[in-house]
């Protein structure tokens, strides 16, 4: 599998730790590098109150031009051809910080494979939205439970069609 996934990065944003756990497991089974997308201004519980239409995440999700700043940077993005991109589903889509990440790099010639965590929502139209933000090829992706069996995760990773 390591030959198949050569030059592969698992990049993720996690608020509660669920996506982090999934990303760590995916990086392990895929023999890929791991990168955490860290917001410049960390999110708080209050920021993520979806019941409050004035919460930070509610405002971001309702503003298609919102691009939360990122504190971390992949120093060697050119070496990666395949990028697993993990995030929680917020308001039925990827958080805006994922769009910031994609727009921060030249993704032309890269294969983007989204994966997400959610208490109830599926990945929805996230791939279509993310495709607008980069020149790479974004596939539909999948939603997982954070404690998915590593063997199932490995099988899913192998089934993706990667750039060589």
Where are these regions (language model features)?
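Generic anion/oxyanion-binding catalytic loop in active/binding sites
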Residues: 8, 87, 142
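N-terminal beta1-alpha1-beta2 submodule of the flavodoxin-like/Rossmannoid cofactor-binding fold
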Residues: 1-82, 92-94, 99, 103, ...
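Short beta-strand->loop
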Residues: 12, 87, 115-116
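A glycine- and small-aliphatic-rich helix-loop capping segment at beta-alpha/alpha-beta transitions
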Residues: 100-106, 133-134
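Short, glycine-/small-residue-rich phosphate/pyrophosphate-handling segment
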Residues: 113-151
């Amino acid at each position: 599998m390591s030959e198949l996934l050569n030059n592969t990065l698992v990049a993720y944003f996690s608020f509660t730790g669920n996506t982090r756990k999934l990303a760590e497991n995916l990086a392990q089974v895929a023999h890929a590098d791991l990168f955490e997308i860290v917001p410049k201004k960390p999110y708080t519980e209050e920021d993520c109150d979806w019941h409050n239409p004035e919460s930070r995440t509610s405002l971001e999700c309702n503003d298609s031009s919102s691009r939360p700043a990122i504190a971390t940077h992949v120093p060697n993005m050119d070496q990666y051809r395949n990028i697993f991109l993990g995030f929680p589903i917020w308001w039925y889509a990827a958080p805006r910080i994922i769009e910031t990440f994609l727009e921060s790099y030249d993704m032309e010639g890269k294969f983007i494979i989204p994966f997400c965590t959610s208490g109830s929502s599926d990945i929805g139209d996230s791939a279509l939205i993310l495709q607008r933000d980069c020149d790479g090829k974004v596939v539909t992706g999948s939603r997982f439970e954070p404690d998915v069996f590593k063997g199932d995760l490995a099988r899913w990773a192998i089934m993706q069609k990667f750039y060589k």
